[in-house]
Curated annotation (Swiss-Prot):
Record SUPFAM superfamilies: Adenine nucleotide alpha hydrolases-like, Argininosuccinate synthetase, C-terminal domain
Organism: Desulforamulus reducens (strain ATCC BAA-1160 / DSM 100696 / MI-1) (Desulfotomaculum reducens)
Residues binding L-aspartate: T117, N121, D122
Family note: Belongs to the argininosuccinate synthase family. Type 1 subfamily.
Name the record gives this protein: Argininosuccinate synthase
Residues that hold L-citrulline according to the record: Y85, S90, N121, R125, S174, S183, E259, Y271
Gene: argG
Length: 401
């Protein structure tokens, strides 16, 4: 019997896909779950997958690889999609695709399958990953084939086959969770006119319910990578988990946004990224201290393109690798500590230090002129403004002004 390897989350979509693949393709279904830091959500998945009809399930602990090979490079790049989204779902998909391919080759499978809808970005991210790593594998996307047209239909399908699902018709949210974030879509969020109900939050308290006293936290970085909290060296997983707790308690990292999907439509989601928001803010503060103006400004342009690549699922591509090389070069001096003040959803710098600081107090303050002769500024301004002067003279001569 041919085998298919399914990216299995245990949620509504992939729960019904197991039965659907067996009924419509006659395949043996092997479920693969990537442990990216979902926590307690993973506990019932083995039993659930087997009860749903899978022949076996792999639950792979990919947390370390996820943080160090996917999150940290994106953090160093400063990549943020459309100024708000910290890419928590986006950079998880290429890693899942990579693991699907590895297990498909190990099992001798002829196909891989996923539960992404035909309207979303994830179908692109999964399938680009497979095309880049194993173009010979068939990819099955049930949402593009079956007669199920809504989550309500999927619930009916599951209930008719005795498949347990974690949602009801009255409370339907589509969620994606990993060690970096949790996303919420669906329900009242489908209308941008509706205020989000913060009852949905799982990692973060609403800012108004955060402590009335500020919390201070100090992050240590080595070459752009976070390595310590309040002076304590920590492994990557422990560091991010601890910052999630600290940020969550202080209402940090809640984003409600309407974004432009790759497939051409807009969508709305609420994202919780408490630890990630702290790291992005702290990393930026350290770069402001340690990078020269030209490099910093050019890197901002790179960050926009990097964010698009990650969002679009083009992770396994020469351009992303080339951009990583540029970013890594810029991070050689991004070493130091950043102290932040957290208060009711807000962050403020409370002290930044680095052995590679480019801030020179003698140059920056109004002290003596031995180091910086202010009279030199006149010549600089004359030369810097020369193109403006020449154009103004031309316009006057030509009667344009």
């Amino acid at each position: 019997m041919p085998k298919v390897v399914l990216a299995y989350s245990g949620g509504l979509d992939t729960s019904v896909i197991i039965a659907w693949l067996k009924e419509n393709y006659g395949y043996e279904v092997i479920a693969v779950t990537a442990d990216l830091g979902q926590g307690e959500e993973l506990a019932p998945l083995e039993e659930k997958a087997l009860q749903s009809g899978a022949s076996k399930i792999y639950i792979e602990d990919l947390r370390k690889e996820f943080v160090e090979d996917y999150i940290w490079p994106t953090l160093k790049a400063g990549a943020i999609y459309e100024g708000k989204y910290l890419l928590g779902t986006s950079f998880a998909r290429p890693l899942i695709a990579k693991k699907l391919v590895e297990i498909a080759e190990k099992e001798g499978a002829v196909a891989v399958a996923h539960g992404a809808t035909g309207k979303g970005n994830d179908q692109v991210r999964f399938e680009l990953g497979v095309k880049a790593l194993a173009p010979h594998l068939k990819v099955i996307a049930p949402w593009r084939e079956w007669d199920i047209r809504s989550r309500e239909d999927a619930i009916d399908y599951a209930e008719a086959r005795g498949i347990p699902v974690p949602v009801t018709k009255k409370s339907i949210y589509s969620r994606d969770r990993n060690i970096w974030h949790i996303s919420h879509e669906g329900g009242e969020l489908e209308s941008p006119a509706n205020a989000a109900s913060y009852d949905m939050l799982m990692l973060t308290v609403p800012p108004e319910k955060a402590p009335d006293q500020p919390t201070y936290v100090e992050i240590g970085f080595e070459k752009g990578i976070p390595v310590s909290i309040n002076g304590e060296l920590m492994d990557s997983i422990g560091l991010l988990e601890k910052l999630n707790v600290i940020g969550g308690e202080n209402g940090i990292g809640i984003v409600d946004m309407v974004e432009n999907r790759l497939v051409g439509m807009k969508s709305r989601g609420v994202y919780e990224t408490p630890g990630g928001a702290i790291l992005v803010y702290a990393h930026r503060e350290l770069e402001l201290l340690t990078l020269d103006r030209a490099t910093l400004h050019y890197k901002e342009q790179i960050a926009l393109r990097y964010a698009e690549l990650v969002y679009d699922g083009v992770w396994f591509a020469p351009l992303r690798e080339a951009l990583d090389a540029f970013v890594d070069n810029t991070q050689r001096t991004v070493t130091g500590t950043v102290k932040l003040k957290l208060y009711k959803g807000n962050m403020m710098p409370a002290g930044v230090t680095s052995p590679y600081s480019l801030y020179d107090e003698e140059l920056s303050t109004f002290g003596r002129d031995e180091v910086y002769n202010q009279a030199d500024a006149a010549g600089f301004i004359n030369l810097f403004g020369l193109p403006l002067k020449v154009r103004a003279m031309m316009e006057k001569k030509a009667g344009l002004r």
